Swiss-Prot record:
This is Lymna-DF-amide 2. Keywords: Amidation, Neuropeptide, Secreted. GO terms for cellular component: extracellular region. It is found in: Secreted. One of its GO terms (biological process) is neuropeptide signaling pathway. The modification Phenylalanine amide is found at residue 13. Its main location: secreted.
Length: 13
C-alpha cells in the first residue's frame, strides 16, 4: 500500500 520510501520512515520507528 505505502511507498517503499514511506514504509522506510515507519520502519525507522
Amino acid at each position: 500500500p505505502y511507498d517503499r520510501i514511506s514504509s522506510s520512515a515507519f520502519s525507522d520507528f
